[in-house]
Amino acid sequence: MTNAELLQEGINLMFAGVGFVMLFLFILIYAIEFMSKLVNTYFPEPVKAPSTKPIQAENHDLERLRPVIVAAIAHHRRQQGLK
């Protein structure tokens, strides 16, 4: 065989290999998509109900915490020698 024939045979084998790999990857992608749809039909994820009332801190809780926060800040400043 001449060098040109060997080069041509190598190129043919390269394209055949690339073609088979691409074909395998496409089949793999479609198989994974199919399995995902199949699993989701038999085992759907439960839908969580939205909470009807947003969580908010009530004003009386904040009013009760205000002196505690002020005392904690004053204690910290006394320890650090800031005041």
From Swiss-Prot:
EC numbers on record: 7.2.4.2
Cofactor dependency: Na(+)
Entry's localization field: Cell membrane
GO cellular component terms attached to this protein's record: plasma membrane
Molecular function terms from GO: decarboxylation-driven active transmembrane transporter activity; oxaloacetate decarboxylase activity; sodium ion transmembrane transporter activity
GO biological process, one term: sodium ion export across plasma membrane
Catalytic activity: oxaloacetate + 2 Na(+)(in) + H(+) = pyruvate + 2 Na(+)(out) + CO2
Subunit note: Heterotrimer of an alpha, a beta and a gamma subunit.
Family membership noted in the UniProt record: Belongs to the OadG family.
Protein name: Probable oxaloacetate decarboxylase gamma chain
Gene behind this protein: oadG
